[in-house]
């Protein structure tokens, strides 16, 4: 707290504190890079739609700002999440008496919520960026099946067309991409559902 009061940065938590309050940054995650005296800062801009426009200016401005706050000998690397397209398809049967289109919208919203890397800590109501967390299809499916009005739900496809090691930027989604699908959290997705009423 004393360091933060002086508006200086030494630990990853200090860099996160300064990055999160920087204009244009919605949330950041900061970590030490193993074996070096460097801080790796990943940021998500405010009101980001997945496009790359404006990234360079924000990265440069934040890097310059953090360079004035770091101690001598520390390297600051500011980067962005990597976007990776994902395709989710499912079959859905709505219970009688429920609007199947509204149930479908609720399902799509739940998928987006589960795969979104921007998370809120329930106790503190503070946002954080979850990068590198495991994604479990069963976990997502259980959350969706709890939605009111669902009689049957099954994911038929959950994949990406991008080969491992070739991260891309997409206007639809953002994710920190690691080598395995199971270690990726997605922001948005291409979702298609086949829906019927019971």
Predicted regions and their residues:
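Carbohydrate-recognition loop of C-type lectin domains
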Residues: 2, 6-133, 195-198
């Amino acid at each position: 707290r004393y360091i933060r009061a002086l508006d200086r940065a030494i630990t990853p938590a200090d860099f996160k504190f300064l990055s999160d309050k920087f204009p244009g940054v919605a949330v950041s995650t900061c970590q030490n890079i193993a074996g070096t005296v460097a801080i790796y800062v990943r940021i998500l801009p405010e009101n980001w739609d997945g496009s790359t426009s404006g990234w360079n200016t924000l990265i440069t401005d934040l890097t310059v700002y953090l360079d004035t706050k770091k101690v001598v000998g520390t390297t600051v690397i500011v980067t962005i999440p990597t976007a990776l397209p994902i395709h989710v398809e499912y079959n859905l049967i709505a219970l009688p008496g429920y609007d199947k289109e509204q149930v479908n919208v609720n399902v799509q919203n739940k998928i987006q919520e589960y795969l979104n890397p921007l998370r809120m800590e329930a106790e503190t109501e503070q946002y954080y960026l979850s990068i590198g967390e495991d994604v479990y299809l069963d976990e997502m499916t259980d959350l969706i099946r709890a939605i009111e009005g669902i009689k049957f739900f099954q994911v038929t496809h959950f994949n990406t067309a991008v080969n491992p090691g070739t991260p891309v930027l997409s206007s639809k989604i953002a994710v920190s991409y690691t080598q395995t699908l199971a270690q990726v959290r997605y922001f948005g997705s291409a979702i298609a559902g086949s829906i019927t009423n019971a």
